Amino acid sequence: MPFSHTKIVGPAGRYGARYGMGIRRKITAIEVKQRGKHRCPSCRSLVRLQRIAFGIWKCPKCGFTFAGGAWTPQTIMGKALAPEELKEVEAQKARWRETAR
């Protein structure tokens, strides 16, 4: 097995001894969250979403493109507002069911 310089520092190992440990720890924390698996807002599948541009994300499974955070698909503020949006969607579905009858 080849020797790995990134066993402890993770993705920040590509910087070697440069930039200081504090910055490299922050980079590691951001990149681990960014490249991890996230839930698609459309198909609800748990996949590695593709970051197309700064804040633009795409689901590889269903092809859904959406705006999210710069480094993560969903921001902290977006998570806080999500329950309210779900209530509105459920209310709309209920209204549609009533009109369909």
Curated annotation (Swiss-Prot):
Cofactor needs: Zn(2+)
Cofactor note: Binds 1 zinc ion per subunit.
GO CC terms, sorted: ribonucleoprotein complex; ribosome
KW Zinc (keyword) present: yes
GO biological process terms held by the UniProt record: translation
NCBIfam families on file: PRK03976.1 (NF003058)
PANTHER family: 60S RIBOSOMAL PROTEIN L37A, LARGE RIBOSOMAL SUBUNIT PROTEIN EL43
HAMAP family in the record: Ribosomal_eL43
Family according to the record: Belongs to the eukaryotic ribosomal protein eL43 family.
Protein name: Large ribosomal subunit protein eL43
